[in-house]
Amino acid sequence: IEDFATKVPQSMKSEYAAPLFCAGITAYKAIKAAEPELHKKIGIFGIGGVGHMAVQFAKVENCDVIAFSRTQNHLDVAKRLGAMDVMIFSENQEEFLGKLKEKHGMLDAAIVFAPADIVTDTAIKSVKKGGLIVIATVGENPAFMAFEEKTIRGTLIGTTKDMEQVIKICDEKNIEVISQTFPLESANEVLKKLKDSEIEARAVLIP
């Protein structure tokens, strides 16, 4: 079992560490997949339990982050955590892309955490020719123009080595983890809250 365990510093609280083993490593791998050393202007689509951590990992890599969400409170969180700019996502794709291009031009890379095909399709169209799209959610792959030479890459989870890096970065860089704690016996109620979007980011159950 030691091969699959990751040591957590004694100074790190369990309720802080718990989300790192799901949301944290997913966010970290998505940023690494976006090749931040080459792509500095990164759009993050979906600022929830995973996206808010991705904003911070991208900042550690000195990227300019533009965050997109349907809800203003998520955008406020992204801005507080270091996003260069934030924009409300709109399903009016032409209008949304027009505003993005006017403010920032085309993105070097886009990362999709929101599980909606319209979001993925919009993210693909927001990236410049030769750019990179990382899909970190499950959904259909919309059609895209091959002659634009864009790369689409999927990612969901990482390795034990990746997890060690997540713990190290979060410990050294004071990455903020947004979560709410609940007693273990309220698990069913918490699942309903998650389903109804009543929890801002992640829920942690305490025995």
Please provide the spans of the model-predicted regions.
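Rossmann-fold NAD(P)-binding glycine/threonine-rich loop
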Residues: T137-K150, T155-K168
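Glycine-centered, small-residue-biased loops immediately flanking beta-strands
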Residues: G131-L132
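Residues forming the Rossmann-fold NAD(P)(H) cofactor-binding site
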Residues: H52-V55
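C-terminal hydrophobic helical "lid"/dimerization subdomain
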Residues: D121, M163-P207
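Glycine-rich Rossmann-fold phosphate-binding loop(s) that bind the pyrophosphate
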Residues: A23, G46-V50, V138
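Helix-to-beta-strand junctions that scaffold the AdoMet/dcAdoMet cofactor pocket
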Residues: V127-K128
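Adenosine-nucleotide cofactor-binding segment
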Residues: K41-I47, K59-T122
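NAD(P)H dinucleotide-binding glycine-rich loop of Rossmann-like/cofactor-binding domains
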Residues: I1-F45
